[in-house]
């Protein structure tokens, strides 16, 4: 009778362990999905920030360009136009980020790097797996239980 009881307990324990592993995998998948959602939202916020910044910077750039051009014409000193050059680079970059194709170009460049320069992207100890995470978790729990 004890053998039947222990066999049943072993099966229940095995089923519970399988359930826990499955649950841990689901939790990890959910965490990865959540991290991707957070990344997408951060990118959307960056684009929105760039568009909002462009409105204010565009106004400043327009007023500065008109003022500097008027000063250069009035004082007959073309050196007044020099600050327009770096301001135009900033304006162009922000416009390209907010409304242009900068993100698509960055994405295609990143995809190209992923395809052709794979060795530069390798992690120091290789890819993180569920098993390696479990091993580290077990070692950490042993460390805390020893103290």
From Swiss-Prot:
It comes from Rattus norvegicus (Rat). GO terms for cellular component: plasma membrane. Residues 1-52, 100-147 are extracellular. Keywords: Cell membrane, Chemotaxis, Inflammatory response, Membrane, Plasminogen activation, Transmembrane, Transmembrane helix. Residues 74-78 are cytoplasmic. Interacts with PLAT. Interacts with PLAUR. It is found in: Cell membrane. PANTHER family: PLASMINOGEN RECEPTOR (KT) (PTHR13411:SF6). Expressed in adrenal medulla (pheochromocytoma). The gene is Plgrkt. Receptor for plasminogen. Regulates urokinase plasminogen activator-dependent and stimulates tissue-type plasminogen activator-dependent cell surface plasminogen activation. Proposed to be part of a local catecholaminergic cell plasminogen activation system that regulates neuroendocrine prohormone processing. Involved in regulation of inflammatory response; regulates monocyte chemotactic migration and matrix metalloproteinase activation, such as of MMP2 and MMP9. This is Plasminogen receptor (KT).
